[in-house]
């Protein structure tokens, strides 16, 4: 084998080992969801003294009825990445405003089972977010338009007049809109 080939192989192996050493980690706020990468020495620094308020506009959902909604898990990533970066948990405020296709993702396991033949894959994530103080707000217009009555919602989910109303109120309270 040539020296060039061995050098290239060693470089590739070194890069591979370095990449495999980098792993996403969950927690400390949401322990089972929201894995994030640690970013060593970022140029754009995180102000660990400020209060972060984020409202997540959750409208999309996977077509599969047995997959966790990645948009909802984004709230767990938000909490975990900032806590891992030194922001105290009490300085992290989050809310989800759920509507449109994502309406199904916040109904109880019983209601989900009746409609889709399986437990709601988002139940544990929603409970963990609520336990961490995240408000889950459901659009009343989607409730009626999509046929998800208040009694079908998971415990603790708040019904609002509309997603628009909730988003305006939260932004008036200095929550910053996160929409993907």
Regions found by a protein language model. Give the residues of each.
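Bacterial Sec-dependent N-terminal signal peptides
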Residues: 1-23
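A cross-taxonomic marker for long C-terminal extensions/tails that follow the last structured domain
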Residues: 7, 22-32, 112-113, 118-180
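N-terminal targeting signals for Sec/Tat export/insertion, comprising classic cleavable signal peptides
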Residues: 31-52
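Second-shell loop/turn segments in exported
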Residues: 57-68, 113-115, 156
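Histidine-anchored nucleotide/phosphate-binding helix
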Residues: 68-87
């Amino acid at each position: 084998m040539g020296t060039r080939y061995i050098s290239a192989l060693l470089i590739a192996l070194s890069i591979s080992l370095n990449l495999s050493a980098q792993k996403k980690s969950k927690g400390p706020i949401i322990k089972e969801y929201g894995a994030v990468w640690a970013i060593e020495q970022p140029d754009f620094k995180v102000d660990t003294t400020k209060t972060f308020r984020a409202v997540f506009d959750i409208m999309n959902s996977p077509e599969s009825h047995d997959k966790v909604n990645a948009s909802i898990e984004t709230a767990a990533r938000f909490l975990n990445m900032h806590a891992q970066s030194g922001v105290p948990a009490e300085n992290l405020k989050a809310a989800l405003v759920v509507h449109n296709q994502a309406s199904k993702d916040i109904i109880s396991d019983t209601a989900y089972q009746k409609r889709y033949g399986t437990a709601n894959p988002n139940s544990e994530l929603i409970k963990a977010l609520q336990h961490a103080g995240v408000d889950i707000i459901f659009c009343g217009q989607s409730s009626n338009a999509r046929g998800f009555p208040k009694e079908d919602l998971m415990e603790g989910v708040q019904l609002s007049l509309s997603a628009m109303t909730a988003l305006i109120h939260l932004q008036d309270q200095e929550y910053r809109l996160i929409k993907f």
